[in-house]
């Protein structure tokens, strides 16, 4: 354990970028005793303990350990985060009992992983997942329960209404906790007026950046519709278009309002705008190489499929969609500059989840921000000091300063000159201990995450009934209605083992056309529904991506 470590550590000779925003210290020397920074100075300016382990950092840069403030943690992610220099994460949605057990296991030194702060269940109405509540009363009760369990912040999700958010925020703020929101049914302005502290993905912003109230309501209705019909694995095309509709002459007023309320924005370029990157093809190839690494064989297939499919989406975009993507991207960058110039604080989050690679996203977010015109110095402060201060941990974490917990990384090169140097990790020290940053194919988390359907894979379909369930031999084509759940665009009906034309009318209904040649022989035919991959198939009660069977009979004429 870090507190029991007897050998002090000295890192000497590199450039120190301490995370405070102050000018870097050349030829620095940093002394770590136990799990704390003891002395921060220059090489040769103080005596080293005789038994110190000395790490030479000549030509390298020392920085605080990095943060990712938007993660949906999975049990296999730990060492990948650490290998990318991410020493602290904020989890914004997981089963509360499991993520708090992970947090506490890491804090006790029992799990080799980044430090975890957690929100537990996200609070919202009608989304059918953990944290699904009805009305302000249930929302308040859940917030109180989560805070009683010791969560570090509270997350509200897309279907959280104004009344619900107000009582959740009051409860959270009374406990000294922040409220973070992935908005859907609320504009950013309405959410902030009801107590929101941070806009995850900058959600709700477009509707607040137009002057006409009817236009804003139309945009909000489009977002609600998108949420209701969203197929996980498909791009948020309409969302790009909403950002493209923002009116630039509103930007100063909106930015000033958010800053006056001390609201942060998490841009999350890697979540919404990755297809707008000029490094798109380079990153696609990089992902391919990463997933080919045999040391990472424990990464679930859903993550591989989700990542690689996301890049392929770009090749299918039509002209209108490309216009929405590019115009929305440009306007969002302009707004973010107005926001920062007005004094706004930016959170560095990636929405890392079962469908996205841990660690790598943080470095891509840095590159996005530099491409957008922000300075590496500011970005580093946002990803370290700013993150710690947002959670009220600034006295202990976030910077390389004497007395603080010793989270520090050493990178090859100078990220102030080239932000990509942040990805060239040489050494990671977390809580005063040198971290093994290698990958190990036998990595196992001692507390595996309980199975539950993923937001980043398709559901397992289930058939409740079919109609009709019978035809006579030699019939004309039959229009087969299938009711159930877990249906998505891309669901396919199999009739007697043969794929047939299928239309998804909703998540609970499919229409299939059974051609006449399949009705030419008497018999009992199996009807199944198969969803496209990746599908949640880890449930031991369900072995593949197909539904339960129903039966269709063809009788004698």
Describe the residue ranges of each PLM region.
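Acidic, glycine-enriched loop/beta-strand segments at the rims
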Residues: 16-29, 42, 357-360, 375-380, ...
């Amino acid at each position: 354990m870090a507190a029991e470590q007897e050998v002090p550590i000295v890192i000497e000779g590199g450039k120190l970028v301490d995370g405070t925003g102050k000018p870097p210290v050349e030829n620095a020397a940093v002394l770590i005793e136990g799990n704390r920074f003891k002395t921060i100075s220059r090489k040769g300016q103080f005596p080293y303990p005789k038994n110190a382990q000395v790490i030479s950092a000549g030509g390298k840069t020392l920085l605080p350990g990095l943060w990712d403030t938007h993660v949906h943690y999975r049990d296999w992610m730990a060492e990948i985060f650490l290998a990318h220099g991410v020493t602290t994460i904020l989890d914004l949605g997981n089963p509360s009992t499991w993520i708090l057990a992970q947090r506490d296991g890491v804090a006790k030194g029992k799990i080799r992983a980044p430090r975890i702060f957690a929100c537990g269940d996200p609070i919202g109405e009608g989304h059918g997942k953990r944290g699904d509540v009805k009305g302000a009363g249930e929302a308040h009760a859940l917030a109180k329960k989560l805070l009683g369990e010791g969560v570090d912040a509270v997350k509200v999700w897309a279907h959280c209404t104004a009344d619900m958010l107000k009582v959740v925020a009051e409860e959270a703020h009374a406990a000294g906790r922040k409220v973070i929101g992935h908005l859907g049914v609320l504009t950013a302005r309405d959410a902030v007026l009801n107590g929101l502290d941070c806009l995850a993905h900058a959600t709700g912003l477009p509707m607040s950046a137009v002057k006409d109230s009817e236009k804003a309501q139309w945009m909000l209705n489009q977002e609600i519709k998108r949420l209701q019909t969203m197929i996980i694995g498909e791009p948020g095309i309409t969302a790009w278009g909403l950002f493209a509709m923002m009116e630039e002459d509103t930007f100063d007023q909106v930015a000033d309002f958010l800053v006056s309320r001390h609201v942060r924005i998490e841009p999350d370029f890697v979540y919404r705008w990755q297809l707008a990157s000029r490094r798109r093809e380079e990153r696609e190839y990089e992902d391919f190489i990463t997933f080919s690494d045999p040391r990472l064989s424990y990464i679930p297939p859903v993550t591989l499929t989700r990542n690689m499919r996301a890049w392929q989406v770009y090749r299918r975009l039509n002209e209108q969609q490309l216009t929405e993507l590019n115009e929305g991207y440009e306007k969002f960058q302009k707004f973010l500059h107005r926001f920062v110039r007005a004094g706004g604080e930016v959170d560095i989050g990636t929405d890392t989840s079962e469908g996205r690679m841990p660690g790598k996203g943080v470095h891509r977010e840095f590159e996005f921000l530099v491409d957008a015109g922000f300075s590496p110095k500011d970005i580093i402060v946002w990803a370290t000091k700013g993150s710690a201060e947002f959670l009220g941990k600034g006295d202990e974490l976030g910077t390389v300063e004497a007395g603080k917990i010793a989270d520090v990384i050493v990178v090859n090169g100078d990220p102030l000159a080239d932000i990509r140097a942040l990805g060239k990790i040489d050494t990671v020290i977390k809580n005063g201990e040198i971290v093994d940053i290698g990958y190990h194919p036998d990595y196992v988390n001692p507390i595996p995450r309980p199975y539950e359907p993923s937001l980043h894979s398709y559901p397992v379909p289930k058939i409740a009934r079919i109609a009709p369930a019978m035809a006579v031999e030699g019939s004309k084509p039959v229009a087969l209605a299938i009711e159930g759940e877990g249906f998505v665009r891309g669901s396919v009906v199999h009739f007697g083992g043969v794929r047939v034309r299928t239309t998804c009318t909703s998540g609970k209904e499919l229409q299939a056309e059974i051609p006449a040649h399949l009705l030419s022989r008497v018999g009992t035919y199996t009807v199944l529904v198969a969803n496209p991959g990746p599908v949640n198939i880890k449930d031991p009660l369900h072995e593949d991506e197909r539904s339960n069977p129903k039966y269709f009979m063809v009788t004698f004429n």
